[in-house]
Amino acid sequence: MGSALKIGIAGLGTVGAGVVKILRSHSRLITSRSGKSVELKAISARSRSKDRGVSLEGLSWESDIIELAGRSDIDVFVELIGGDGNPAKEAIETALKSGKHVITANKALLAKHGQELAELAEKNNVSLKFEAAVAGGIPAVKALTESLAGNKINRIMGVMNGTCNYILTRMETSNLPYETVFNEAQKLGYLEADPTLDTGGIDAGHKLAILSSIAFGTQIDFKAVVTQGIELVSIQDIEQAREMGYRIKLLGVSQMTDEGLEQRMQPCLVSANSPIGQLENAMNMIIFDGDHSGQIILRGAGAGEGPTSSAVMSDIIDIARGNKIPTFGQSANSLIKMKPVLTSTPAAYYIRTKLEDSPGVLAKMATALGNNGISIDQMRQTQHADVAAPVVIVTHKTLPETLNKALIEIMKTDVTLEAPVALRIEDV
């Protein structure tokens, strides 16, 4: 058995404390499975006195994470402080330049700087690993870089933000409006400090960008991910979707087309009987479609102390075993800079708006759609007691750019009393 692998951890929040607990409680198990002992050597966090529910006795404390990253007595630097810039970025760069392996759960940083950090890791012949950055305890990164390495990936699809899935599930099961469930989720601590990272689809978009890079051999480009949040989803949308046999999910889809790499994260209607449609509460699900493997479905908790710290430990054990895999599954220099493209796959759409309750208004809306070559599959008008008539239209398949032109034309008419909300109906 070789010499101990020495670890330094920056960040002792929920995940960092969870990693310390696993290292303390499972030391013999880790040694037997990795072939060498793993020793937690040094730590760093904002508060030294805070009770984290685990003993920190015997550990060296660094008040400066940059100093921790450069210490000569650690082999692996674990970054768990977050943020898409410094000090996390500087600390990771310091560790890599010092010849240390790096493990991070920082999806925002990877989505923004992943390419340059991967190149730096390769230059210094060390590993940059991030299983915990995508979907918590689900081994999505390992599935792509290892288990499916012999496959051409046709499509990635999934629910990658548990908070949004919780909100949408709660709205449906409790018949509560978005604002009420949002406030409830905030009180439960489900939301990021900036809630729009969750509800705006940004957090999930970061994860999709990372997986896309691995699956399609491309440089990470988060700006190319079309993101739309769940803020405009109403209880009426939830009810209408249910009546038609659908559920609404914040759905990520990435696929290579003839035009380029298509990446989108947006609320969609999916079949209630599909695996994604049956996903409840704060769970995540990621589906990889490989040309030989077929459809691989991974489901599990996407956040929380246990699942995320488990993912960090997976990376630690990989390093202890000497497993060396390029950061994004292949040499960073071989990753292609792809032209981003808008969605080129046609789909049916759900449209909800309010129209003036007067003769001829539905005909005007149908004309605006027809002028753009969009046919109507069904139209629903709910009962109302005021001058505004709530209307739901489901179209036949069309391209999003065509739909957008039609929506602009609809808005220019004198019959709409609110901006239409359009949700894609995705075949899953």
Regions found by a protein language model. Name each.
Residues W61-E62, V78, I103-A105, L128-A132, ...:
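General beta-strand structural signal in soluble alpha/beta enzymes
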Residues E122-D203, I210:
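Rossmann-like NAD(P)H-binding beta-loop-alpha module
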Residues H101-I103, I376:
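A short hydrophobic/small-residue beta-strand
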Residues G83-S98, K107-T145:
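Rossmann-fold NAD(P)-binding glycine/threonine-rich loop
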Residues A311, I316-V428:
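A conserved regulatory-domain signal marking ACT and ACT-like small-molecule sensing domains
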Residues T180-Q278, M283-M285:
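Substrate-binding/catalytic subdomain of NAD(P)-dependent oxidoreductase enzymes
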Residues G294-I296, G300-G306:
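Glycine-rich phosphate/pyrophosphate-binding beta-alpha loops
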Residues M1-S98:
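N-terminal glycine-/serine-/threonine-rich beta1-alpha1-beta2 phosphate-ribose binding loop
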